[in-house]
Every structure is written in C-alpha cells, then in structure tokens.
Amino acid sequence: MKTIANESSLLDTKVPEPTLRRLPWYLSYVQLLHADGCESVSSTRIARAVGVDASLVAKDLSYVSVDGRTRVGYRVADMVAVLNDFLGFTHHHRAFLFGVGSLGAALLQDSGLRHFGLEIAAGFDVNPDIVDTNINGIPVYHKSRVAELCARERVDIGILTVPIRAAQSMADEMIAAGIKAIWNFTPWRISVPEGVVVQNTSMYAQLAVMFNRMKSLP
C-alpha cells in the first residue's frame, strides 16, 4: 500500500529529527575550527556560533560517540571525524537524477556533493536535446533505460527534479526500477510504498516561509 511520504521516514528512529537537522550545523562549524588549528571546543562556543542553547548542543551530541571533557570540551578533530561518519558523509553513495531541467542540470554541475558522499552517476530525461549528452562529465539517458541501468549500476538512490505533473509517475517508475530512497525536490508530496525512503526538499515551501516572515518586519 502506498502512503504519502513523510520526511521522518528518512531518519534514524533513535535520533530525533531536529537533532539530525542540527548536527550538520555543528559539523560545519567544527570543520572551520579544525582548519584554523583549533584543538578543542566547548558546547557553549558551538551554541553561540550556530544560535542555539548550549544544553541543546550537549544533548544532540549525546546521540553520537563524541566524548566531552569538563573544562576542556570536545576534541575538534574527533568531532569532525565522528560527525562525518555518523551523518553518512564518509560513505560512498551513488544516485541517479531524474529531470535534467534547470535545477537538475545545476545539481549535475555541483561537484561539491561528492564531498558529502553523494555521486550522481547519471541523469535521465525525455528531451531529445538533452538525452545522450554529458553534463559535467555525467551522462544523460532517456528515462526508458532506468530499470536497465539501475540493475547494472546497482544504484538505489534517486533525485527527483521533474515538473510537478510528472512527479508521481516518475517516482513510480523509479521505485519499480529498484530505487529505495528518493530526494524529492518537487513541491509534490509523492506517495510511496512501505520500505521506500523519501526526503522532501521544496525550495518553494522555504520561499513561502521566508516571504511570510518578512511580513512581520518593521
């Protein structure tokens, strides 16, 4: 049976979703400290840098194997290594991208994703002007080859950047081909069967939140 995908389906049930969303903030900050040669950092300093309460930082870090020392804090090098591993950034994941329009093409151009453990192995589209081309060294195929290439390349992550009207049908094709996790950039809440992970990243929703908050500005 299909259900509307909930973002929490992505998350480790042992770790609260807000915690998982904050951990990359901490990682970014301690990476800067590490680059500057800093050896230790307190939860108070981390909290001040990212704009949260120090007790929240300590609680969040209790879910990962980072040990802090009284009056010393956390070893920066250890935090960088542990957080990178815990968040999956040190592991190699391969993905296919579906919908090579302006957003999809931009993601294909973003080599920085590799630094977070994600390699986009191929793109898929139906536009004859795009199919059988390469973007940033990444081949673009017709979507009719999805099942064949998923099996051959053993890819189980899909990035969905198609127009909204095609979102559900493309998601269905992706899942039928063997995709087990979908990073959904469309504003459509796709329905998926049990056992398929979905992470919704709608820029339009974030834009709406920003516009709404701007209304309260003086």
Curated annotation (Swiss-Prot):
<dbReference type="GO" id="GO:0003700">
    <property type="term" value="F:DNA-binding transcription factor activity"/>
</dbReference>
<comment type="subunit">
    <text>Homodimer.</text>
</comment>
<feature type="DNA-binding region" description="H-T-H motif">
    <location>
        <begin position="25"/>
        <end position="64"/>
    </location>
</feature>
<keyword id="KW-0520">NAD</keyword>
<dbReference type="GO" id="GO:0003677">
    <property type="term" value="F:DNA binding"/>
</dbReference>
<keyword id="KW-0804">Transcription</keyword>
<dbReference type="InterPro" id="IPR003781">
    <property type="entry name" value="CoA-bd"/>
</dbReference>
<comment type="function">
    <text>Modulates transcription in response to changes in cellular NADH/NAD(+) redox state.</text>
</comment>
<dbReference type="GO" id="GO:0045892">
    <property type="term" value="P:negative regulation of DNA-templated transcription"/>
</dbReference>
<keyword id="KW-0238">DNA-binding</keyword>
<comment type="similarity">
    <text>Belongs to the transcriptional regulatory Rex family.</text>
</comment>
<dbReference type="InterPro" id="IPR022876">
    <property type="entry name" value="Tscrpt_rep_Rex"/>
</dbReference>
<dbReference type="InterPro" id="IPR009718">
    <property type="entry name" value="Rex_DNA-bd_C_dom"/>
</dbReference>
<dbReference type="InterPro" id="IPR036291">
    <property type="entry name" value="NAD(P)-bd_dom_sf"/>
</dbReference>
<feature type="binding site">
    <location>
        <begin position="99"/>
        <end position="104"/>
    </location>
    <ligand>
        <name>NAD(+)</name>
    </ligand>
</feature>
<keyword id="KW-0963">Cytoplasm</keyword>
<dbReference type="InterPro" id="IPR036390">
    <property type="entry name" value="WH_DNA-bd_sf"/>
</dbReference>
<protein>
    <recommendedName>
        <fullName>Redox-sensing transcriptional repressor Rex</fullName>
    </recommendedName>
</protein>
<keyword id="KW-0805">Transcription regulation</keyword>
<dbReference type="GO" id="GO:0051775">
    <property type="term" value="P:response to redox state"/>
</dbReference>
<dbReference type="GO" id="GO:0005737">
    <property type="term" value="C:cytoplasm"/>
</dbReference>
<dbReference type="Pfam" id="PF02629">
    <property type="entry name" value="CoA_binding"/>
</dbReference>
<dbReference type="InterPro" id="IPR036388">
    <property type="entry name" value="WH-like_DNA-bd_sf"/>
</dbReference>
<dbReference type="Pfam" id="PF06971">
    <property type="entry name" value="Put_DNA-bind_N"/>
</dbReference>
<keyword id="KW-0678">Repressor</keyword>
